Regions:
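N-terminal segments that cap or nucleate solenoid repeat domains
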Residues: 2-43
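Terminal, low-structured helical/coil segments at or just beyond the last alpha-helical repeat
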Residues: 10-17, 214-242
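Short helix-capping/linker turns of helical repeat alpha-solenoids
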Residues: 27-30, 43-45, 50, 64-66, ...
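Cationic, low-complexity basic patches in intrinsically disordered or flexible, solvent-exposed regions
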Residues: 35, 64, 71, 100, ...
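Hydrophobic face of amphipathic alpha-helices that form TPR/SEL1-like repeat modules
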Residues: 36-43, 72-79, 108-115, 144-151, ...
Length: 242
């Protein structure tokens, strides 16, 4: 994945009844309100979309050490949205948030180290930050960490560990992870070969538009036995009547 990501606001953060109340709190210096206000301007929610205004409020919150705002600000510098693109500034703000434990920032910082944007390319550092993020439940980081284990780059090749992280991400509906998990079941790498389980995960990924899964699913359905097993696997996952 080569697109920087940010998370939605955490459930334990403040909320305001109206946009005006949030803006008033932001103007009074409330960092969380400033961060929310930045998101509103970025997405055009409650106000006309204005990326420069979004960056202004993200910066105010980031300078008060709000980790979510730091992550958003870092991504703005990474993508050049509302500010001139500057990878060094992106790395600076993402590191600030990552060191506070923000999983989206940790993932994005790992991406910078993997690609060598704003920091010297360093796969070991990339894996370090992907692991930190993955352990906090961030699915994109779980997927990237799984890929490192599957390929044996930087870390010892470990198909079982790859399956573990693919599964964690797949259960959070990440299509690429669902597809790769299906491939693991198809080939028996890191898990016992299971054509029905492979088809099950290919179906889940294919429904989200994953082209590789759609192709592999077509190949599997050429086998009547695999198709019948897949139907049984799908039935197991279906909600049961009371």
């Amino acid at each position: 994945m080569l697109v920087p990501l940010v998370k939605t606001m955490a459930a334990n953060r403040k909320s305001w009844d109206t946009f005006e109340a949030m803006r008033a709190a932001a103007q009074e210096g409330d960092a969380q309100a400033q961060c929310y206000l930045g998101v509103c301007y970025q997405n055009g929610q409650g106000a006309e979309q204005n990326h420069h205004e979004a960056v202004k409020w993200f910066r105010r919150a980031a300078e008060q050490n709000d980790s979510v705002a730091q992550c958003y600000l870092g991504v703005c510098y990474w993508t050049g949205q509302g500010v001139p693109q500057e990878f060094g500034e992106a790395a600076k703000w993402l590191r600030e948030a990552a060191e506070q434990g923000d999983p989206a920032a940790q993932f994005n910082l790992g991406m910078l180290y993997e690609t060598g944007q704003g920091v010297p390319q360093n796969y070991a550092e990339a894996v370090k930050w992907y692991r930190e993020s993955a352990q906090r439940g961030y699915p994109a980081a779980q997927f990237n960490l799984a890929v490192f284990y599957e390929t044996g780059q930087v870390v010892p090749q470990d198909f079982t560990e790859a399956v573990k992280w693919y599964l964690a991400a797949a259960e959070q509906e990440l299509a690429d992870a669902q597809c790769n998990l299906g491939l693991c079941y198809q080939t028996g790498r890191g898990v016992e070969k299971n054509p029905a389980a492979a088809v099950k995960w290919f179906i889940k990924a294919a429904r989200q538009g994953n082209k590789t899964a759609q192709h592999n699913l077509g190949l599997h359905y050429a086998s009547t036995e695999a198709a019948e097993l897949a139907v049984l696997e799908e039935a197991k996952d279906a909600p049961q009547p009371p």
